[in-house]
From Swiss-Prot:
Pathway: Porphyrin-containing compound metabolism; bacteriochlorophyll biosynthesis (light-independent)
Cofactor dependency: [4Fe-4S] cluster
Keywords assigned by UniProt, alphabetized: 4Fe-4S, ATP-binding, Bacteriochlorophyll biosynthesis, Chlorophyll biosynthesis, Iron, Iron-sulfur, Metal-binding, Nucleotide-binding, Oxidoreductase, Photosynthesis
Alphabetized Gene3D superfamilies for the sequence: 1.20.89.20, Nitrogenase molybdenum iron protein domain (3.40.50.1980), Proto-chlorophyllide reductase 57 kD subunit B (1.10.8.550)
The species this protein was found in: Rhodopseudomonas palustris (strain BisB5)
Name of the gene encoding the protein in the UniProt record: bchB
Entry protein name: Light-independent protochlorophyllide reductase subunit B
Binding site for [4Fe-4S] cluster: 36
Length: 535
């Protein structure tokens, strides 16, 4: 067990809650102590849902452990059925509740409810949130759609002439990163291809909708971490093919359109020719040339991290210097992607390892989760959020998908704006000592009048740590290896170098000083090092 102040994923029962909360007519009875009810806040506070999750907790306390906790669970299940009248019920235990070993599935089925009751057995101490969501969706699909499965060996009937092809959208859940808007975007894209959506699951689906998943011609796997297992089962039992491409980014969206068109047997030429997105033109415009070869570090769930790496490299001209994920189940896919960009993959759920890697690589932009936002802020690096887990500001009121052509526009704005702000910050820092721009200067539009006198503080000689006015990304290894000391005037001169290359300039200067036996780095040393490495 590891004590930490941050986790990328919650326990697996939180994943089950995400599925249940996204659906309609489904209720989740969770054998859990009172302390586990914190999970409600994830949906009401962070996602800003206007109603509580459809979850009933047994909320046993320490005094109940000497009694019949099984009876406590059965009473909670009966009360939930009578109060909410769900179409189906799932039952399980939280990480703490599983230690009691009361068998919620067997207890609930013994109550004889006239609705489907699906037991969700989640290994709380071996698996995490996304796996829990995937397992819950898989068990629901098996239990509700399974009775309508064709006989073994039976072939899938051909679609009648003139009938529009249909598909299911699999994977969107509550608390997902832009899942709500991705559904709208992909539904519209499929509509342009002449394809109807049969069911979106689990988001917005009822148990009756899950039961008719087999009616569709194929499945669109929007988020493989959640829908991959269910899609594989539907392919095996109902002979429904499913998509492999996740349409995040312009190139991936075009590939997705071609793949879907092939599965549905439709012509995608008109849709591809009419595709409208501003990202390609914006990224090729003169104003965007400064994006070329920007060093970017990417971390998130596997789906969004791999997609972000492709966009960064192929569509924006960034240089991917780091790629990682907390999704251990998709380690193989991430390693293959990392090999493509010639970087070492980082597969971990320890945010301290991620922070150390960011500090080591000195990126100019970090793309990650809410934690990477904090890490980048501490290190003084621009950051954009690309993946769950996220905080409340990443559930915007506006339409902001990540998928499709409009999603590409949103991604361009989201990723580039932090760099724009960084450029402005650099200009302000560069000219802050100029006689026209210092704090005591009169505004230029007010003529040549005299400004109010301002007390001017003369900088005294100070240690390098005090002289520095902007956060530096300096790894522990580099700091330990450097024996040279920075003179105050050299530190001041270093601040005139743009912040997004300042770390590299510092490292090169210290390396030059160490190789040439320079004990104190002066302004002359700084420029000698610049000339040396410019050859």
């Amino acid at each position: 067990m590891q004590l930490t102040v941050w986790t990328y994923e919650g326990p697996p029962h939180v994943g089950a809650m995400r599925v249940a909360t996204g659906m309609e007519g489904l209720h989740y009875v969770l054998h859990a102590p009172q302390g586990d009810t914190y999970a409600d806040l994830l949906f009401t506070m962070i996602e800003r849902r206007n109603k509580r999750p459809p979850v009933t907790y047994t909320t046993f306390a320490a005094r109940d452990l000497g009694k019949d906790t099984a009876e406590l669970f059965m009473k909670a299940a009966r009360d939930a059925y009578e109060r909410f009248k769900p179409q189906a019920m799932i039952v399980g235990a939280s990480c703490t509740g599983s230690l009691i070993q009361d068998d919620p599935g067997g207890l609930a089925k013994s109550l004889g409810f006239p609705i489907p009751v699906v037991a969700i057995d989640l290994p709380a101490y071996q698996r995490k949130e996304n796996w829990g969501a995937a397992e819950t969706l898989y068990q629901l699909v098996r239990a509700l759609a399974g009775p309508k499965a064709p006989a073994p060996g039976a072939k899938r009937p051909e679609r009648a002439p003139g009938v529009r092809p249909t598909c299911n959208l699999l994977g969107p859940t509550a608390l997902g990163f832009r899942h709500r808007d991705d559904i709208t975007e992909i539904t519209g894209l499929l509509g342009k291809l002449g394809i109807d959506v049969n069911v979106v699951a689990p988001m917005g689906a009822t148990p009756a909708d899950i039961a008719r998943l087999g009616d569709a011609d194929f499945n669109v796997v929007m988020y493989p971490e959640i829908a991959g297992q269910a899609a594989s089962w539907l392919h095996r039992i109902f002979h429904q093919p499913f998509t492999k491409t996740v349409p995040i980014g312009v190139s991936a969206t075009r590939d997705f359109i071609k793949e879907v068109a092939q599965l549905a047997g439709v012509d995608a030429t008109a849709v591809l020719e009419a595709a409208s997105t501003r990202l390609p033109w914006y990224s090729h415009s003169v104003d965007s040339t400064y994006l070329t070869n920007k060093r970017v570090f990417i971390f998130g769930d596997a789906t969004h991290a791999i997609a972000a790496a492709r966009i960064a490299s192929e569509e924006l001209g960034f240089k991917v210097v780091g790629l990682g994920s907390y999704s251990r189940e998709f380690g193989r896919e991430l390693r293959e992607a990392a090999k493509h960009y010639d970087v070492e993959p980082l597969i971990t759920d320890d945010y301290l390892e991620v922070e150390a890697k960011v500090a080591e690589l000195h990126p100019e932009l970090v793309l990650g989760t809410q934690m990477e936002r904090h890490i980048a802020k501490r290190l003084g690096v621009p950051c954009a959020v690309i993946s769950a887990p996220v905080h409340v500001q990443d559930f915007p009121a506006r339409y902001a998908p990540q998928m499709g052509f409009e999603g590409a526009n949103v991604i361009f704005d989201t990723w580039v704006h932090p760099l724009m702000m960084g450029l402005e910050e650099h200009l302000l820092t560069m000219f802050k000592d100029d006689f026209e721009f210092k704090d005591g200067a009169m505004p230029s539009h007010l003529g040549t009048g005299h400004a109010a006198p301002v007390a001017e503080v003369i900088a005294e000689s100070a240690p390098p740590a005090v002289a520095a006015t902007a956060p530096e990304i300096v790894s522990v290894a580099n700091a330990a290896a450097s024996a040279a000391v920075w003179a105050p005037e050299a530190e001041k001169e270093l601040q005139k170098i743009p912040f997004f290359v300042r770390g590299k300039a510092r490292r090169n200067t210290e390396r030059f000083a160490n190789e040439n036996g320079v004990a104190t780095i002066t302004v002359e040393t700084l420029y000698d090092a610049k000339a040396h490495f410019a050859r």
